[in-house]
């Protein structure tokens, strides 16, 4: 590739990896570039990579690496860096997700609303997110392919693998959630096991304080319906050698340090300081910054409790850990015999005895196990002694074996706690495994880890290549000749038999005399010509392998020791004989063939190879998804991006390998619209009159003489380097055009300057001639003027002398006249002031006199009226006592008294028990109130005393002031007496001193008074609060008394001769139902409870006799007419719902509202609920909203309370009190005079009105929710402009030969049509405008929320052209709102504030000139800084190519967002939907117009019923009196 001057490139730099540069000079074999670090560098062309010249136009970053113009290392690196600076931590590379650890909390990305947004969304449709990958795996497993899936999470220590795994499991539980046993989900149980696994499997390394030293594969199992049915955890390659050997500054496993810091538990196991144990003191790092070992110990114990490990097993686990530590402190010295050993000293013997005690085994057997081994032969058992080194190795082998078995036991128990589904056929596995490792010193663990990563990389390469093939197939292009990049040769080098590195290592381990030198020699001899294996220069045993991520040098010093995993028979026999069931359970008895040999060799590498093989088989049977976690810096700080470290991780994570696979095929893919929009300037003649983008693309490529490109169905595929050729040609054309424009512009500027200079010279000449002429004329005019001036000066001097004389005379006269006038005016003013004072004083006297007379008159009138009222009250009482009705009732009650004795006795008992409990409560309240009242009285008395003192001091101060005034006046009057004057001065000084003392006392008194008043206010507040509680109790008590009064009336009016046996039970049920005892079941929110749920029904025998006397019960058999009215659509007459009017007329005629007990209201409510539950309920919702609201309006206006439910308190208690209060004053809501009769409402009627109100709210809520469901698909389409619209707008903006086409608003027209249809439906059903206004307002609020949230979640929507498209759609909604008027639309336009301001921000020009204050206050006042920051980070100008908000504003917003993130618990930038009911009962009463039901006739379909013939005989039925 040739480079020209001015071309933007990437140049490699040691510290930064890659830096931006610009070509300054291009030579034959070298290129001189000027880097962003202001350095001139001369490099060869092969070391340069092209950079996109338009990288800043799209916001400087893309959310998918495949969208990069140049897919190369620096492009990937800097794209991640720019997105990380904007807190965009997720980025796609095809189907691979790259997650950069933010090292800060971002809760808005992981709340439940965000999970709901990504549910069921195709991968890549929304912004990159780990939830998108999890949803893709779930959708393919459960919906599309019915095939198990796997998610591979990899990265180095501290990159966020574990947190990402938690988020994946959290999302999978959300979409396939199952409530597991003990009220814990599977995800919770797996996460609760994390602290336990971290304690026993994590340790501090050089790079990470909490590094996982094992691999983990979590398999979540699903049933056929997609619900989670179980889970399992598998672990790989625990770093056992860390138990016995660590290096500084690393640590051993966390559990050892936690146990040593456990306090009493540590003393119980005879543990001391960490530094006293050999397995822990090999490193000087004992504590972790920000971590308390003791606290972590108790967290681990709590995790064991959660997982289900018993207390006995917990004690055994920690005893085993303590025994391992004591085991490490056992030291050996040479014994008496050759090659033998024994315990060194008493300290070692103490640790030996302690370890044996903790293992619960024989100490002598432990000594013999450590210092010797037995060999079984035909002749017998031969015991061979071990030397010191062998005994220490035997000790370490025992410690590693015990710890490994303990770890496996923990994993097994965790799996048992979670629960596995063996019948599950669909699984989603989440692999959290260590990433590629390359340190200064790399040992056997790094070799195994990198071997596993090579295996996974091969699987990854195959998957990426497969994805490439699938895209090529979908685009129908030829791809058969593309080569596949494979790393099979590295895998053969490591694992191939019989001469692979692992095979050679196992062979060396089987020979006791083999060393790492013999192993290295044999390896170099077998692989001397292998391209991937190298021998290091300065070591005979170290070797280097060229992995996919780079070269790694391994030190073989400890390869053999770490690979040997002997199963020592003595170890198994020792611990299987332990008296502790837990320890003996870890070591089962060995088979016969194992007993014959003391050492049974087992290769760690071979076993890991088999585990890895099983894992790869599992992964191959699933469809993989990849998440690559990246650690941006080694300091674990937010907003710090280290290029070199990230680049190394990208290479190790296989991301750049995926880039290389893409480069092997067609790395550059562009849609035809994007390609034509970018490169149409190369062949402008093709743009004239042509709209076939594919043909234009082909013409451009053929014109540029490019080969090996492919034209797919929707995209053009270019080989590596071809896009650079096109960009160079495009840059040349644009440069030529720029030079041409500059030349024309310079010509224009030069001519303009020439014309301006010529006009200036002409102006200067004219000005000079004018100056000369004006100078000559001025001389002549001055000569003539001198004569005239002299004449006028002489005249002026004479005139001035005359005027001075006249002015002097006038001044003397005016002074004299003024003096006379002022003296006269002073006399008049004094006289007038005296008159005003006299008149004011007389008026004041008469006003005071009048007020006294008026108060006396009012008092007399009040007394007289009170006297008259008392007389009238006595008359009324006497008349009431003499009423015959009372005497008749008294006679009837006396006759029935004997029959009701038993029932009343029971009622008294129930009543007495309830009153007793209430009286006790009231007495308690009264005592509290009395005590507080006493305190209040004491405080008031104290305040009064202070106030009296204050008045006394004030009076003394006034007296002192009067004395001072008098003394001062005497001083003035007796100025001649000097001695008296001095005495008065002394007296004044003493009085002033006394005055100051009194003022100080007054200030102190005021302060104490203020304190007392504050305390008094606090006491009064408490007293008021208690008084309110007492009022509430009194209200409840009064309501219960009223209800009891109703029940008592019923009891008095019922014959009981034949029902005494069942009366006690019935009354108890009725009483419990009336006062709301716990027996009654709570109702759901949207159910409409019937009145009989509150009034318990009486026995059939009682109700039969009662029915014969109440009018409503005589008509109860005719409730079918009401059911017919409800089930049929009776339509409307003159805008009035016929069904509601007919139902109200029937209930009014049958006196249902005056009945104390009836079931007819139950039938009405239940019938309405049944209609709303039917199959056609959605279509009838507007009809029933109109009918129920009309019926509720009639009840509200025509029912009144009979005074039964009035309470003595000012405030009504509960819902019943509110209804009673409403019914007591129905005229409050009526704007006209009461022409309709008011009916006295009883308790069932009041409850019926309450249930009808709930029914109206239910219908409104169902209708609103249905509308939201219907409009949601339309909104999902409207948020983004159609592809054809975007392509045409782009071509119109950059191609001169093509005119712009108007944007298609068909999707928005669908929304307008939907709203028109909704308005027509609501108007056809005569729904009140109040409901229409509330419904439309909430619907537009939902539109605002959906459009705004979609805008923030989809980057392709945050463009200039898309903003214009959405703005045009919003203008259609504005026109619709204007057309329907405010009566129906209300504040709907205001509800669209968020989306209007966001779209307005997208389409403004010159965004870089806007400050943060202008954006917050002028452009987006309703939006939060987090929302504005989200829009700015996603915005890009796809139409004009302009830049977005300035970097200073973005940095300021990022700082504010980070600061808010630390303070807020939930700081999502998305909006929440409003599901509340936006009106109350009072709103309905005031908003719904009154209805005259008199002129509504009975429909013909109902006229044959006999029970409604009265509706045909009378037009306006009146209730019978």
UniProtKB/Swiss-Prot annotation:
UniProt-listed GO biological process terms: actin filament organization; actin filament-based movement
Domain IQ: 733-755, 756-778, 781-803, 804-826, 829-851, 852-874
Assigned protein family: Belongs to the TRAFAC class myosin-kinesin ATPase superfamily. Myosin family. Plant myosin class XI subfamily.
PROSITE patterns for the chain: DILUTE (PS51126), IQ (PS50096), MYOSIN_MOTOR (PS51456), SH3_LIKE (PS51844)
InterPro entries: Dilute_dom (IPR002710), IQ_motif_EF-hand-BS (IPR000048), Kinesin_motor_dom_sf (IPR036961), Myosin_head_motor_dom-like (IPR001609), Myosin_N (IPR004009), MyosinXI_CBD (IPR037975), MYSc_Myo11 (IPR036018), P-loop_NTPase (IPR027417)
Tissue expression as described in the entry: High expression in kernels and stems, intermediate in ears and leaves, and low in roots, silks and tassels.
Positions of region (Actin-binding): 493-527, 529-552, 587-612, 612-634
Function (record text): Myosin XI motor protein required for endoplasmic reticulum motility and protein body formation. May function by binding with its tail domain to receptor proteins on membranes and exerting force with its N-terminal motor domain against actin filaments, thereby transporting its cargo along polarized actin cables.
UniProt-recorded Gene Ontology molecular function terms: actin filament binding; ATP binding; calmodulin binding; microfilament motor activity
Pfam families cross-referenced by the UniProt entry: DIL, IQ, Myosin_head
Keyword list, A-Z: Actin-binding, ATP-binding, Calmodulin-binding, Coiled coil, Cytoplasm, Motor protein, Myosin, Nucleotide-binding, Repeat
Myosin N-terminal SH3-like domain location: 4-53
Any one GO cellular component localisation term in the record: myosin complex
Protein name: Protein OPAQUE1
Quaternary assembly: Interacts (via C-terminus) with HIP (via C-terminus), but not with zeins, FL1 or intrinsic proteins of protein bodies.
Domain notes: IQ domain mediates interaction with calmodulin. The tail domain is a globular cargo-binding domain.
Gene source species: Zea mays (Maize)
UniProt key word Oxidoreductase: no
Coiled coil start-end: 870-910, 974-1050
PANTHER family attached to this UniProt entry: MYOSIN (PTHR13140), MYOSIN-15 (PTHR13140:SF781)
Binding site for ATP: 155-162, 208-216
Domain of life: Eukaryota
Knockout mutant characteristics: Dilated endoplasmic reticulum, small and misshapen protein bodies, and opaque endosperm.
Domain Myosin motor: 60-731
Residue ranges constituting the Dilute domain according to the UniProt record: 1162-1459
């Amino acid at each position: 590739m040739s480079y020209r001057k001015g071309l933007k490139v990437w140049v490699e730099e040691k510290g930064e990896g890659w830096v931006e540069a610009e070509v300054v000079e291009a030579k034959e074999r070298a290129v001189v570039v000027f880097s962003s670090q202001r350095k001139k560098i001369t490099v060869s062309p092969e070391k340069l990579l092209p950079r996109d010249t338009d990288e800043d136009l799209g916001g400087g970053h893309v959310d998918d690496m495949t969208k990069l113009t140049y897919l190369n290392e620096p492009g990937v690196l800097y794209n991640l860096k720019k997105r990380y600076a904007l807190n965009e931590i997720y980025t796609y590379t095809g189907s691979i997700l790259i997650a950069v650890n933010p090292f800060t909390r971002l809760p808005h990305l992981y709340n439940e609303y965000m999970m709901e947004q990504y549910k069921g969304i195709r991968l890549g449709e929304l912004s990159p997110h780990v939830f998108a990958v999890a949803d893709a795996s779930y959708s393919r497993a459960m919906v599309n392919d019915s095939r198990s899936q796997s998610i591979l999470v990899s990265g180095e220590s501290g990159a966020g693998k574990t947190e990402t795994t938690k988020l994946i499991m959290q999302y999978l539980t959300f979409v396939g959630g199952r409530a597991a046993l003990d009220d814990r989900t599977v995800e919770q149980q797996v996460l609760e096991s994390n602290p336990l696994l971290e304690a026993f499997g994590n340790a501090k390394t050089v790079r990470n304080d909490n590094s996982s030293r094992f691999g983990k594969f979590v398999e979540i199992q699903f049933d056929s319906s997609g619900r989670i049915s179980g889970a399992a955890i598998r672990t790989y390659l625990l770093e056992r050698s860390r138990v016995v050997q660590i290096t500084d500054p690393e640590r051993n496993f966390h559990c050892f340090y936690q146990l040593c810091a456990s306090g009493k538990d540590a003393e119980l196991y005879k543990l001391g300081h960490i530094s006293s144990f050999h397995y822990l003191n090999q490193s000087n790092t004992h504590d972790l910054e920000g971590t308390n070992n003791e606290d972590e110990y108790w967290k681990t114990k709590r995790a064991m409790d959660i997982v289900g490990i018993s207390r006995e097993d917990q004690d055994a686990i920690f005893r085993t850990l303590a025994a391992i530590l004591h085991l490490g402190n056992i030291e050996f010295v040479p014994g008496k015999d050759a090659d033998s050993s024994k315990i060194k000293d008493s300290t070692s013997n103490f640790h030996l005895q302690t370890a044996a005690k903790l293992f619960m085994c024989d100490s002598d057997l432990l000594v013999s196990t450590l210092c010797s081994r037995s060999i079984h032969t035909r002749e017998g058992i031969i015991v061979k002694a071990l030397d010191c080194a062998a005994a220490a190795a035997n000790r370490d082998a025992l410690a590693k074996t015990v710890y490994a078995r303990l770890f496996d036991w923990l994993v097994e128990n965790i799996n048992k706690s979670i629960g596995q589904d063996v019948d599950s056929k669909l699984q989603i596995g989440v692999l959290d495994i260590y990433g590629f490792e390359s340190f200064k010193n790399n040992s056997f663990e790094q070799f195994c880890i990198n071997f596993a990563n090579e295996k996974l990389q091969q699987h990854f390469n195959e998957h990426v290549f497969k994805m490439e093939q699938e895209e090529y197939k979908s685009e129908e292009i030829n791809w058969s000749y593309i080569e596949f990049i494979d790393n099979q040769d590295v895998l053969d080098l490591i694992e191939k038999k019989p001469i692979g590195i692992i095979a050679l290592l196992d062979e060396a381990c089987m020979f006791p005399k083999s060393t790492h030198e013999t192993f290295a020699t044999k390896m170099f001899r077998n692989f001397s010509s292998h391209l991937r294996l190298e021998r290091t220069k300065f070591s005979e045993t170290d070797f280097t392998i060229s992995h996919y991520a780079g070269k790694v040098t391994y030190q073989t010093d400890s390869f053999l020791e770490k690979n040997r995993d002997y199963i020592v028979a003595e170890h198994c026999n020792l611990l299987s004989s332990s008296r502790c069931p837990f320890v003996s359970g870890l070591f089962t008895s060995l088979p016969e063939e194992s007993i014959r040999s003391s050492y049974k060799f087992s290769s760690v590498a071979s076993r890991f190879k088999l585990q890895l093989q099983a894992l790869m088989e599992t992964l191959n049977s699933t469809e993989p998804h990849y998440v690559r976690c990246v650690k941006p810096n080694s300091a674990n700080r937010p907003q710090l991006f280290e290029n070199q470290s990230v680049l190394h991780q990208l290479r190790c994570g296989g991301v750049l390998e995926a880039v290389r696979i893409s480069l092997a095929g067609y790395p550059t893919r562009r849609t035809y619209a994007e390609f034509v929009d970018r490169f149409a300037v190369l062949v402008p003649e093709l743009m004239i009159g042509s709209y076939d983008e594919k043909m234009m693309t082909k013409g451009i490529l053929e014109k540029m003489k490019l080969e090996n490109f492919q034209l797919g169905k929707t995209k053009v595929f270019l080989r590596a380097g071809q896009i650079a050729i096109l960009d160079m040609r495009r840059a040349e054309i644009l440069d030529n055009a720029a030079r041409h424009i500059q030349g024309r512009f310079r010509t224009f500027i030069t001519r303009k300057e020439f014309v301006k200079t010529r006009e200036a010279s002409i102006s200067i000449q004219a000005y000079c001639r004018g100056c000369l002429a004006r100078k000559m004329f001025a001389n002549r005019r001055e000569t003539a003027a001198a004569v005239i001036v002299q004449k006028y000066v002489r005249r002026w001097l004479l005139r001035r002398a005359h005027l001075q004389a006249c002015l002097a005379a006038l001044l003397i006269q005016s002074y004299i006249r003024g003096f006379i006038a002022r003296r006269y005016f002073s006399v008049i003013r004094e006289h007038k002031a005296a008159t005003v004072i006299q008149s004011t004083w007389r008026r004041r006297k008469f006003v005071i006199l009048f007020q006294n007379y008026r108060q006396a008159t009012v008092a007399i009138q009040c007394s007289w009226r009170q006297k008259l009222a008392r007389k009238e009250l006595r008359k009324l009482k006497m008349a009431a006592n003499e009423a015959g009705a009372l005497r008749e009732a008294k006679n009837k009650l006396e006759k029935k008294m004997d029959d009701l004795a038993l029932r009343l006795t029971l009622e008294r008992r129930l009543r007495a028990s309830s009153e007793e409990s209430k009286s006790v409560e009231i007495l308690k309240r009264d005592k509290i109130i009395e005590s507080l009242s006493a305190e209040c009285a004491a405080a008031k008395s104290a305040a009064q005393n202070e106030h009296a003192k204050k008045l006394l001091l004030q009076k003394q101060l006034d007296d002192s002031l009067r004395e001072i005034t008098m003394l001062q006046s005497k001083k003035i009057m007796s100025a001649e007496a000097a001695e008296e004057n001095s005495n008065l001065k002394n007296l004044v000084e003493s009085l002033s001193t006394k005055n100051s003392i009194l003022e100080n006392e007054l200030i102190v008194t005021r302060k104490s008074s203020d304190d007392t008043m504050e305390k008094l206010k606090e006491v009064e507040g408490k007293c008021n609060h208690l008084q309110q509680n007492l009022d509430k109790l009194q209200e409840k008590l009064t309501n219960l008394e009223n209800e009891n009064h109703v029940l008592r009336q019923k009891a008095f009016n019922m014959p009981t001769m034949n029902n005494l046996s069942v009366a006690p039970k019935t009354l108890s049920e009725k009483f419990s139902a009336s006062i709301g005892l716990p027996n009654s079941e709570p109702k759901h929110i949207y159910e409409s409870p019937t009145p009989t749920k509150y009034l318990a029904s009486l026995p059939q025998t009682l109700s039969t006799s009662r029915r014969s006397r109440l009018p409503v019960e005589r008509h109860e058999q005719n409730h079918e007419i009401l059911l017919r009215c409800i089930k049929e659509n009776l339509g409307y007459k003159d805008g009035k719902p016929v069904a509601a009017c007919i139902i109200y007329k029937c209930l009014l005629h049958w006196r249902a509202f005056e009945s104390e007990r009836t079931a007819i209201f139950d039938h009405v409510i239940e019938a309405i609920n049944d209609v709303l539950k039917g199959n056609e309920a959605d279509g009838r919702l507007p009809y029933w909203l109109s009918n129920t609201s009309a019926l509720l309006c009639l009840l509200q206006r025509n029912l009144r309370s009979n005074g039964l439910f009035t309470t003595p308190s000012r405030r009504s208690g509960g819902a019943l009190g509110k209804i009673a209060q409403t019914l007591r004053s129905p005229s409050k809501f009526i704007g006209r005079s009461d022409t309709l009769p008011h009916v006295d409402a009883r308790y069932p009627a009041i409850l019926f009105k309450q249930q009808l109100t709930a029914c109206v709210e239910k219908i409104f809520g169902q209708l609103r929710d249905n509308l939201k469901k219907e409009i949601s698909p339309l909104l999902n389409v409207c948020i983004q402009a159609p592809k054809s619209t975007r392509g045409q707008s782009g071509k119109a903006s950059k191609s001169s030969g093509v005119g712009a086409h108007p944007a298609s608003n068909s999707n928005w027209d669908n929304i307008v049509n939907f709203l028109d249809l909704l308005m027509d439906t609501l108007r056809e059903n005569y729904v009140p405008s109040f409901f229409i206004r509330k419904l439309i307002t909430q619907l537009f609020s939902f539109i605002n929320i959906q459009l705004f949230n979609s805008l923030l979640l989809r980057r392709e929507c945050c463009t200039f052209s898309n903003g214009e498209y959405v703005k045009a759609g919003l203008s259609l909604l504005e026109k619709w709102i204007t057309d329907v008027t405010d009566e129906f639309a209300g504040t709907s336009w205001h509800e669209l504030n968020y989306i209007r301001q966001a779209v307005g921000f997208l389409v403004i020009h010159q965004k870089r000139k806007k400050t943060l204050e202008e954006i917050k206050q002028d452009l987006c006042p309703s939006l939060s800084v987090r929302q504005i920051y989200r829009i700015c980070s996603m915005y890009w100008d796809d139409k004009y190519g302009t830049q977005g908000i300035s970097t200073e504003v973005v940095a300021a917003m990022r700082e504010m967002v980070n600061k808010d993130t630390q303070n807020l618990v939930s700081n999502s930038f998305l909006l929440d939907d409003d599901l509340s009911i936006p009106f109350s009962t009072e709103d309905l009463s005031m908003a719904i117009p009154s209805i005259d039901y008199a002129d509504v006739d009975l429909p013909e379909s109902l006229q044959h019923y006999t029970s409604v013939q009265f509706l045909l005989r009378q037009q306006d039925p009146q209730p019978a009196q």
